[in-house]
Curated annotation (Swiss-Prot):
Name by which UniProt lists this protein: Metaxin-2 homolog
Subunit structure and binding partners: Associates with the mitochondrial contact site and cristae organizing system (MICOS) complex (also known as MINOS or MitOS complex).
Gene: mtx-2
Chief location of this protein within or outside the cell: mitochondrion
Pfam families cross-referenced by the UniProt entry: GST_C_6, Tom37
Keyword annotations from UniProtKB, A to Z: Membrane, Mitochondrion, Mitochondrion outer membrane, Protein transport, Transport
BP-aspect Gene Ontology terms: mitochondrion organization; protein transport
GO cellular component: cytoplasm; mitochondrion; SAM complex
Summary of the function given for this chain in its UniProt record: Involved in transport of proteins into the mitochondrion.
Effect of deleting the gene: Knockout animals show abnormal mitochondrial morphology. Mutant worms display developmental delay, with almost none reaching the young adult state.
Similarity annotation: Belongs to the metaxin family.
Subcellular location: Mitochondrion outer membrane
Length: 230
């Protein structure tokens, strides 16, 4: 097992042990949503808030300028329950599931598999589209990304940190063979996601019927962000 695999397993085991603790003094840490958070982070922060409200679990939102540096893996949002830290939509959903709270008890195994496939498609494909536009498209980076990401820092950090973050994201895109894609090709990928989700939704109220699941929370987070982004 690789070192990253060992670390992932250790974190998973720790969360499994900590899932038994009471749901008390719970805070959700996010970047400044109106001024700092980028599209994909805003979407995930909104998705987690939506999911937790669906489960009726109480929590407080705390906006901080340096959440991605506080986060153990740089992923936001960051859920803090007592001394336990959980980062990102999927990990937070899994942690809540381990506490016996789920939105999928009414679903069949096939529907649960479809729901997880939807989450994977949104997380891995749509989020990658958003990162490409924000960090790889020069005009968007100069006019939007750099300004928002650096808005909470003083110079020279306001220039240095966006540059460092851009280099990291571009490496991620390169690892996925997205670095050579055109904007038209990226748009086609986004259209693929929207068509697939639209076909599944059909005339239903939610993706899997009359009741919402975590996939609906995640979809809402991204769609609301895409529709309202300026």
């Amino acid at each position: 097992m690789s070192s990253s695999g060992v670390i992932t397993q250790l974190v998973t085991d720790a969360l499994s042990m900590n899932a038994a603790q009471d749901w008390e003094d719970v805070s959700l840490f996010t970047p400044y949503l109106n001024d700092q958070a980028l599209m994909y982070d805003f979407a995930d922060c909104l998705a987690v808030q939506t999911f937790l409200r669906m489960t009726s679990l109480p929590f407080n939102v705390r906006q901080r300028p340096n959440v991605d540096f506080i986060s153990p893996d740089g992923v936001v949002p960051l859920l803090k329950i007592n001394k336990t830290l959980i980062t990102g939509f999927n990990a937070i959903v899994d942690f809540v599931h381990k506490k016996g709270v789920t939105l999928t008890s009414h679903l069949s195994e096939t529907q649960v598999a479809d729901m997880r496939a939807n989450i994977s498609m949104i997380e891995h494909l749509l989020t990658t589209v958003e990162k490409f536009v924000l960090w790889n498209h020069d005009e968007t980076y100069d006019k939007v990304t750099k300004l928002r990401y650096g808005s909470v820092y003083h110079w020279p950090l306001s220039s240095v940190l966006p540059f460092v973050k851009r280099r990291k994201i571009l490496e991620e895109l390169s690892d996925k063979d997205w670095d050579t894609k055109t904007m038209d090709e990226v748009g086609e990928q986004a259209d693929k996601v929207f068509r697939a989700l639209s076909a599944q939704l059909g005339s239903q109220k939610y993706l899997t019927g009359d009741l919402p699941t975590e996939a609906d929370a995640l979809l809402f987070g991204h769609m609301y962000t895409l529709i309202t982004v300026r």
